[in-house]
Amino acid sequence: MTAPSHPSGFDWSRLERVTADDPLRVLFSACLLGHATGWEGGAYTEPLAVRLAGLPLVRAMYFCPENATLGTPRPLTTLYDGHGRDVLSGRARVLETTGRDVTREIVRGAEAMREAARRGGAELAVMLDVSDSCGSHVVYIGAPEEHRYQQGPGVAAATLMEAGVPVLAQRDLATLQRLIAALDPTFTPDPAAFDFVDHPWYRDYFADGPVGIKLGE
C-alpha cells in the first residue's frame, strides 16, 4: 500500500506483518471504548475505535490519564499559555474551572499513560481530540466558556509522541477507516470520509494561525 503521512511516525508496512500471534498493539483513550471516564462521568464512544479495538489482529489497551490522577467525575480543565508540549516544557499550565492549578496532576497522568504504553508495547494510540490530555490536533486555550481553540496536542498526547508512539485522533475518520480496512477485508471504507485537518471547520478556524481568534462552534 502507499503509506499516508498520518499519523506521524506510524509504520504502515507493519500492517503487512500483523498476525494473530503478533497483533497490532493499540492504546485507546478509555472513553472512546465506552468507559465512563469523561470529566462529567460519561463516555464518548466512537464506533470506529470500538471496531478497531475488536479486530482479531489488534491487541487493544485503554487508559484515561485524567482519571488516573484526578478521578471521575472531576472539574473540567483547560490549558493556559500554550498546548501540551508547552506544559511539558514549563511554559503553560492546566487549570480547573474552579481555578485550581492541576498541571502537576495532568503531567503525572500523562506519564502514567506513557508507562502503560511502554508496558503494552503500544505501536499506535487512538485518542480523544480537544481533550487537554488526549487531544492531538486541537485543544482549548483559556476558559472553556470562551470556546477558543488552538492547534497542538494535549499533555498526554504530547508525552506519547515524545516517547515515539504515533497518535491518531478519533476524528481522523479517513485514516481510521484505512487502518481498519487493512486489517479486516470485510470492511469497506467510506470514500467521502476525511481526517479532522481536512474538515471545513478546522480549515476555516485556523486559517489565520495556530490560535483561533474568534469564537468556536
Language-model-derived ranges and their functions:
Residues 130, 134-157:
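Short Gly/Thr/Asp-enriched flexible loops that form oxyanion-binding sites at enzyme active sites
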Residues 31, 128-131, 172:
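Short, well-ordered beta-to-alpha junction loops that form the rim of enzyme active sites
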Residues 44-94:
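Short, surface-exposed acidic-centric catalytic microdomains
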Residues 34, 70, 132-135:
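Short, active-site-adjacent cap segments at secondary-structure transitions
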Residues 77-78, 141-142, 182-186:
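Short low-complexity, flexible loop/linker segments enriched in glycine and/or proline
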Residues 11-21, 47-59, 71-73, 109-124:
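Short amphipathic alpha-helices and their capping/turn segments at secondary-structure boundaries
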